[in-house]
Amino acid sequence: MANGSEVIIMKLIKAIIKPERFEIVKKALEEKGVTSMTTTEVQGRGEQKGITLEYRGKQMIVDMLPKIQIEIIVRDREVDELIATIIGAARTGRIGDGKIFVLPVDAAIRVRTGEMER
């Protein structure tokens, strides 16, 4: 609780985007005041289902494509604005632009101090 009585509702925004859009998305989030985030290199597929590449004259199907996963913990009231920011920076209009998930967060605990936000 903040201020003794206010309950802070937190959410986890998990965005999976094309790697080449990461720096653009990061900059857009920083401009909105987001400085803390976790990123992970992941592989995935959705509607895109993969691509066909040619290597040494042979065709190869790559069905799991590289993506970047961004995780941000935010207050509930910030979710809509940050989703719009991510979409605006990540969207190319082509299949494979990514996906955004929003999940509830029960608590955040700072390891160094043990301080807990609920």
Regions found by a protein language model. Name each.
Residues A2-R118:
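Positively charged, small/polar-rich N-terminal and surface patches that mediate targeting and assembly
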